[in-house]
Amino acid sequence: MLYSQMSKEQLQAEKTALEKQYADFKAKGLKLDMSRGKPAPEQLNLSLDMLLHCLDGDYKSSNGIDCRNYGVLDGIPEAKALFQEMLGVSADEVIVGGNSSLQMMYDTIIRALQLGVLGSEKPWCRYDHVKFLCPAPGYDRHFAICQALGIEMITVDYKEDGPDMDTIEKLVSEDEEIKGIWCVPMYSNPTGITYSDEVVKRFANLKPRAKDFRIFWDNAYCVHHLSENHDHLLNIIEECKKAGNPNMVFEFTSTSKISFPGGGLAVVAASKENIDFIKSHANIVEKAAEAE
């Protein structure tokens, strides 16, 4: 039975049982690995068959690429199709990367600092200050990227349906040095908030003073539902298109909490124009790797 369906008495009984279970665990004096976000061995075992038999027989992707060899810049069709379904985007709106979406976020900001983004008048590093809006509580690794790169962080409070959009709309419309915002739009830690439809639409309709402002949409938990009765999140890329701001968002996710965290896939999704811009620079690195 779902907790939401339990009576007060049933919830109290469940609480008492869990507290006893917790006390029993404490009494054992265990030394446990409580690393945040690390799947248990039982969860990893669920993916073993996929790993053990992935190279049985045919090694080629649907477009004839030998998957034992060098891949392709934006991912094989099967990998792109997986993320197309997860995020509701088209094949030309995704780049499949390594196993870390956080690495792709870092690379995206580094590229913006050094080269700018699509439509930039100059690289972000040419401004006296670069600022990011940081809804809090948020993900400490997002904030660590800003801290490491000297990006000023501006805290934005949360409401029950997402970040304080009145504050966000005001700040981005007034300050050209605000170049981005971090967002965890679904099941955001530690509150579990999923952005409401209104919040997503207001993000898509932002009118930032900085023409190269970007929303960093870390949709890490887009398919991580606990029950059939789960939250739903509007498609930010589609909403940005409707609002006339198709290039304003970078969306990220990965399979880290789905299969093997160290051996999964990560992705950046964005408008075709944004993706083409990223590929035009990433292509240099790929050609260098193939030449080694």
Q: What are the language-model segments listed below?
A:
Residues 35, 157, 253:
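Residue-level detector of conserved, well-ordered beta-strand and adjacent loop positions
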Residues 59, 65-211, 222-244:
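Conserved core of the PLP fold type I
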Residues 218-219:
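Walker B catalytic acidic pair
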Residues 2-74, 78, 84-85:
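N-terminal "arm"/small-domain region of PLP-dependent enzymes with the aminotransferase-like
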Residues 97, 238-292:
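Conserved core segment of the aminotransferase class I/II
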Residues 43-48, 226-230, 262-264:
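Short aromatic-enriched loop/helix-cap "lid" or pocket-rim segments at secondary-structure transitions
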